[in-house]
Amino acid sequence: MLSIVVRAQADKVMVTYKDDGIRLTVNGKDFVVNGMNWDYFPIGTNYSYSLWNDSDETIRQALDTEMGLLKNMGVNTIRVYTGIPPKWIEYIYRTHGIYTMLNHSFGRYGLTIAGAWAPNTEYADPRVRDLLLKEVQTLVAEYRNTPGLLLYLLGNENNYGLFWEGAETENIPMADRKSTQRARAMYKLFNEAAVLMKTADNTHPVALCNGDLLFLDLIAQECKDVDIFGTNVYRGVSFGDLFDRVKKEYGKPVLFTEFGADAFNVISNEEDQTAQAHFLKGNWREIYENAAGLGKSGNSIGGFTFQFSDGWWKYGQTLNLDVHDANASWSNGGYTNDFKQGENNMNEEWFGICAKGPTNAQGLYQLYPRAAYYVLKDAHQLNPYAPGTTLAGIQRFFEGVSIPDAALRARGDRAASAGEKGKILRLSRFGAAFTSFNTGGSLITTPKDPDPNNPVFPNQLGFDHMQSLFVGVEANPSPNMRANIELNVLGNVAQNPIDQIFYENRGRPVQLVGP
């Protein structure tokens, strides 16, 4: 009997330096990251939900729907946090041809140290160091041979976490440099983790995720062994001097781990698909223009648009999870379409390039592409590494990417989304509750049968039942106004519950005795 074991073969991904710039290569071929920040959160859930806890059939249906849409628009890589099983990374790759950048948060949202939860990670703490290094070593051991794995990403703008007290996005205190000492300890640990990971796996690069360029000087000093400078950047339609600064001050390739625009206008107080598409078009144009071989900075290897679908849980995190909140939680002058000095204009729950539909009985939902989806579908047809590509050619290409045309294509999706949600008025609840009560015992004063001349409660031994009908109507005339009314129609009200105070007892029949 002959037994043959075939091992899954992972791709060899490398960062290559040439005179004309820096490239990411996969099995020797140039690879530009047309990426998307992807997650799966049905309306009504938050960060505590995980798709990977569902059945394989449910996961497969969710992935096939979402990855099909992503592949259709030209996405070749998704950014996913740890927790996704290796088999689904492989499934996404083999079924849909999409790679995964695996993201370890590296203490961004707190850690459990010695049995106690610490919301703000102190990277200089030896216990933190030991825990995080152990976690990334375990991560590499589990995923390094997974087909479809593109690279590892450490953190998520952890430098901002040195200022913020929680996970919710806030304004950034850029002038506050009191955290420099904490930041240095953090970046040293990033580098130490990268060394360990690359020692165990030399076929997948390691990137860090920074918030914009804050502490770039420390990164250049402390993170010499990190392969890729990943950065979350929200500057509006242009990244400004970012490419040149990273080239001069750090010398590593630039990978935008987050960037984008929300699809809500706080001035007009309504969805604004055109503005979102405008900002993303400008961002991707600069990403391609700064790729290697085109005469500019030559250090851009791609990016991950933020994000694929709206996160209805982002504002408040645990409250109003079934409400698409229009509250703006931070301000950014780069988004000139709705910026007012002193007022917030960034709406965390509206960053999706797809709107999200209601959840069905299986826990799945449909997506409805916005204009930005169609703009990116056109933009991702460009390959900056294709022979004959020039800066002038890229400029002509993007002049042909039409936002009005994309908005027209998205109108049908918007109408379908609004129709499914019942935009202005909808039935929010319709149900019935039937409850039985049994009262019994030998050492009690409750009568065996009800006595109309002695209306005591409980009024009898044995069984009785309750009937309630619930009807709810919700009005949503505008994104910042929502009203809901619920009616409880009582049928039969039980007379024998031992608890004498309960909501339904107001519906007990009252017997009036006349003269």
What are the functions of these language-model segments?
Residues 134, 207-226, 231-240, 262-304, ...:
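Non-catalytic scaffold segments within catalytic domains of secreted glycoside hydrolases
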Residues 410-477, 482, 486-490:
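Short glycine/proline- and aromatic-enriched beta-strand/turn motifs that initiate or cap beta-hairpins
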Residues 198, 472-474, 515:
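Transmembrane beta-barrel domains of outer membrane proteins
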Residues 25, 29-229, 239, 247-249:
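Active-site mouth of glycoside hydrolases
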Residues 477-515:
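Gram-negative (and chloroplast) outer-membrane scaffold detector with strong preference
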Residues 306-420:
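Aromatic-rich peripheral "rim/lid" segments of glycoside hydrolase catalytic domains that contact
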Residues 111-118, 162-172, 250-290, 300-301, ...:
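Active-site clefts of carbohydrate-active enzymes
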Residues 124, 181-182, 450-460, 502-514:
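Extracellular loop and loop/strand-boundary signature of outer-membrane beta-barrel proteins
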